[in-house]
């Protein structure tokens, strides 16, 4: 059998390279991974990208890009529609296509290719079920062929590779050996001898054969997978389609689809296959997959030799990898972090396989004659072999000899293929060498020119080198000087260490004192607790004493209640006497009420009569006056408005005749007329106001009458007070007399006020008159000013305005007459108001005489009543004296009981005072010193820290010891010229690491010595610089002490140290 379809291309075809399509599918976590708490470290971040992490919290990620990536939630139908569905059309067009699943064991390869469900006749390649790619592809092919309505045949085969042994899963004879041979007619293809291809006609036939193959396939249970595939399988589908050619000749189109399910790579320890046959299976599986990886690497690197023959698996897939087949790879991986190494290996191989290029070619369409001829030749060949075997007249060889010839032939073919590949590789290498030679020739010319430039630069560099050597010598000397400085600092550090130990000893002593102080505080706390308990006990005793005092108070309260009842009885008796007195008083009150009612009735009648007459006269006079005045005002207003309208009409006629000349005059004249109207209207309003003021002036008369009525009401109130205050009748009578005299005085005062109000009204009338005269004057002045203005305008204007001036003069005369008329009417109104007030004054005099008569009569009656009531009050006083004597006795008894109770309470308080003294003297504890509390002391420790001498002094002495007279002893080690800067920087880089570290110690000015900063070795200043201490506010700090030990604080007043010694100053 030919795995590639067994057809050769006899016509030249257009070849185009095509990369292998690579897909990745990530399965979800299974139950085993959930049990071992394996975390997901693989993420599908896009339709084409996969990101992996070594651990869940790792920030280092690796991203792979493929043609398509499927996440854990992807379905079987999604994978098929993307990967295999496009290949079905290519198969029907006559291409050979291959799809194989690659990955670690237990990642879902068999699930993807075969599925977990058994395919049924009603199953469709588009439904959402767990059937795999193989049954979906067969169903899809049958559906497409049925819709094409062509004649076709379909044959399938199911090949298994187990422990490098081939097996036909659909064959009924297990003894048949299957071999692989290279196809001499088609380079890169193999022929599988002994593999049975079974024709199928429906989906049912295919599903039955597929189930048969699944049952015969080698599977086993491992720790990684309950049904782990222990072999590789290749499911091949060959489709022959009959179609008519251009000349009407029958043509046969052949397409082939290989669906490969590879066994997964395994780790022996993880899978639990350390013993037995499983070890051999694992070794063979891993060996074949390793060879597949090497083939992929060789194809990607375009190596001259691809190791197809090192494994039967790679020989089966030879045409699919780098051949004439359209190939797709599905890489299945696990998302758990326990399998991250295998996952990364699978992703890297799959990512590398993307670069493999195939050259897909359409299988040649064969005519019916060609097919029959091939079949006839093959039948004749088989017949001859059969006859030779029967007749035994052919060439017979020993089995060993035949085996040697076969092996020799295979080795020669293998060697020939290798030589051909080697020759091709040598040719490619020769082309590369020629290309390199041309490039080298071109670069040689460029290098020659560069060499000349380099020689010139060399001469310049030699001069620079001499200068650099000098700088290097100086730099080495400076290095030694810095080394000497470091040694001085080390000596200082040793002294500082000794001082630090002394300070730590003082700190330990202070710590011990602190612990003893804490013990003292604890003892005082315990003493406070005892005092608190004593206070609680004292509180309980005092509470008992207070309860006893409360009991005595309750007893005293009961005694007071009994006395209260006795006093209540006496009060009842007194109330009986009071009731009798009240009865007598009520009779007297009734008599007084009758007398007061009579007096009140007389006063009320008199008051009503007076009010009626006054109001009648006032209403008649006011109404007549207002009506007359309003009628006159309305008549005058109508007359004035008519006259003004007439004058305006005349003026308007004149203006129409002289419109062009009198526009400005018309506006001014209209303004004057409007002001006149406004003054007339304001005058009318003021007249209304004056009338209202006159009406308001009549109101005081009504208010005086109202006051009289209120005085009568006061009389009634006084009578009621007499009824309520019979217990002090005599005093009330005197008060009534006084009030009546006051009322008489107030009535006379009110009459005087009425007289004053009359005079005030007369004055107001005079003011109104003067106001009217003022308005008259204002009107005359306004008219005169208007006349003067109009006269000036007329003189400056046209003669046609003479008539308007005449009208204005008539209006002025009319206004004067109107003012005189208003003055006359106002005088008449003033006279009528005076008559009205005279009448009111007469009525008030009569009312006053009548009120005095009523008052005299009331006084006589009251004197009679007072005498009778005084006799009754004397009798009741004697009865009250008897009741008061009894009440006095009861009060004395109450005082005696109170004295006894007070004595008892005094005794209880003495007991409480004794308890308090006992608590203070015996129970209340005080603190007793133990003698362990530390006393105040002075801690002795170094208060002045050592410091290193100035760097200039150290360097100067060091130079004198070494007798370096060639250097300037007055210069510091940091000086360098500007011209040496660049060279010194290169020289410093050539020093050792120790030298570079030493150069990081800068020199700071000390004791007024100025240190010059250059640009060489003092560029890196850091916090380790030695600085002199500064005494500010009694505190000193040292940079050296900060870098070596914690900072120290000197007490106030400690002297600042001065550096003046050679090496160290204490």
From Swiss-Prot:
Changing residue 726 to D: Mainly tetrameric. Mainly dimeric. One of its GO terms (cellular component) is mitotic spindle microtubule. This is Kinesin-like protein Klp61F. The modification Phosphoserine is found at residues 949, 1043, 1050, 1054. It holds the Pfam family Microtub_bind. GO terms for molecular function: ATP binding; cytoskeletal motor activity; microtubule binding; plus-end-directed microtubule motor activity. Homotetramer. Consists of two pairs of polypeptides associated by coiled-coil interactions to form two homodimers. The homodimers are linked by lateral interactions between their coiled-coil regions to form a bipolar homotetramer consisting of a central rod with two motor domains projecting from either end. Parallel coiled coils extend from each pair of motor heads, switch to two antiparallel coiled coils in the central region and then back to parallel coiled coils. Interacts with Wee1. ATP binds at residues 103-110. Residues 990-1002 have a biased composition (Polar residues). Residues 1033-1051 have a biased composition (Low complexity). SUPFAM superfamilies: P-loop containing nucleoside triphosphate hydrolases. Residues 362-462, 540-569, 639-738, 808-875, 889-918 form a coiled coil. Important role in mitotic dividing cells. Microtubule motor required for spindle body separation. Slow plus-end directed microtubule motor capable of cross-linking and sliding apart antiparallel microtubules, thereby pushing apart the associated spindle poles during spindle assembly and function. Forms cross-links between microtubules within interpolar microtubule bundles. It is found in: Cytoplasm, Cytoskeleton, Spindle; Cytoplasm, Cytoskeleton, Spindle pole; Cytoplasm. Transmembrane segments: none annotated. Phosphorylation is required for localization to mitotic spindles. Phosphorylation of Thr-933 during mitosis controls association with the spindle apparatus. Phosphorylated in vitro by Wee1.
